[in-house]
Structure formats: structure tokens, C-alpha cells
Regions:
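A short, polar/proline- and glycine-enriched secondary-structure boundary/capping micro-motif
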Residues: 24-26, 53-58, 134-136
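NUDIX/MutT-family hydrolases
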Residues: 114, 126-136
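A glycine-rich, hydrophobic loop/mini-helix early in the fold
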Residues: 32-62
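Acidic, metal-coordinating catalytic segment for phosphate/diphosphate chemistry
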Residues: 1-32, 36-39
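Active-site segment of metal-dependent pyrophosphate-handling enzymes
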Residues: 83-123
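The catalytic Nudix box helix
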Residues: 44, 59-93
Length: 136
């Protein structure tokens, strides 16, 4: 299985394996998806226990990295379905850059594109990616 790569930025300048980018704190593209229901509750997920990066952390509905050639919306839709098992229309709201080093030697340094969508049903989570979920 080929190792997942991330897109280095600000203009795309190349690809790098995801783990290496997090080890070297190289700026790369990412996205965060927030799903709301009709009660204006947000769907949160708890990352699966076997994830190398922040296992069991409660986080937004889903977040990941764009693949080469994917738009932000395509990437968000792909990963939302892979992790949470549903599709819904997404809208990109804004983007920002952040850097956050962690105790495990990895650093998030991302140009993060934030998207929102709406869904009122229960997701069908992928246990390889998601431990649990809840509306909050």
C-alpha cells in the first residue's frame, strides 16, 4: 500500500509522505469539515484508538489532507464518506495557517481549509478511523 502524501504549500511545490511532513513541521494543505444538524448541534468524532496521530482525541466531524489533483470540496467529501459513511453538500468558509507542536514529536503546520455541511441522521462510522461520535 502506497504511503499517503500531503501537498506542500503555499503554491503547490511538491508532495511529501504525511508522517514525514508532520515530523519535519513542513507547511502543507489540510481541511476540516464541520457537520451541523437542524438543532445547530455539531457532529464530533473521536479518533480511532489505533491512529498514530492523536488516537482517541475528540475532534471536528472529519479532517485530513487533500490528494494531488483534488479540490478542497472533493477531498472533504471523500474523507467524510470514508470516515463517517455519508455524503452531503459541503461549502468552504475560510482557510487559515497554524502550527502546533506536540509531545509525540509531530507538528501540525497546515494551511487548513474549513468546510461546513448539514446532516440530520446518524453516521455509519468506519471503525478503522473513528472510535465514537456524538452531537454536541
Amino acid at each position: 500500500m502506497k504511503e499517503e502524501e500531503v501537498i506542500l504549500v503555499n503554491e503547490p511545490i511538491g508532495l511529501m509522505p504525511k508522517l514525514e511532513a508532520h515530523q519535519k513541521a513542513v507547511l502543507h494543505r489540510a481541511f476540516s469539515v464541520f457537520i451541523l444538524n437542524d438543532k445547530n448541534e455539531i457532529m464530533l468524532q473521536q479518533r480511532a484508538h489505533q491512529k498514530y496521530h492523536f488516537p482517541l482525541l475528540w475532534t471536528n466531524t472529519c479532517c485530513s489532507h487533500q490528494r494531488s489533483g483534488e479540490t478542497n470540496i472533493e477531498a472533504g467529501s471523500r474523507r467524510l464518506f470514508e470516515e463517517m459513511g455519508f455524503k452531503t453538500e459541503l461549502k468552504e468558509l475560510f482557510h487559515f495557517i497554524y502550527q502546533a507542536p506536540f509531545d509525540n514529536g509531530l507538528t501540525e503546520h497546515e494551511l487548513d481549509h474549513v468546510m461546513i455541511g448539514y446532516f440530520n441522521e446518524n453516521p455509519t462510522i468506519n471503525p478503522e478511523e473513528v472510535e465514537a461520535w456524538k452531537w454536541m
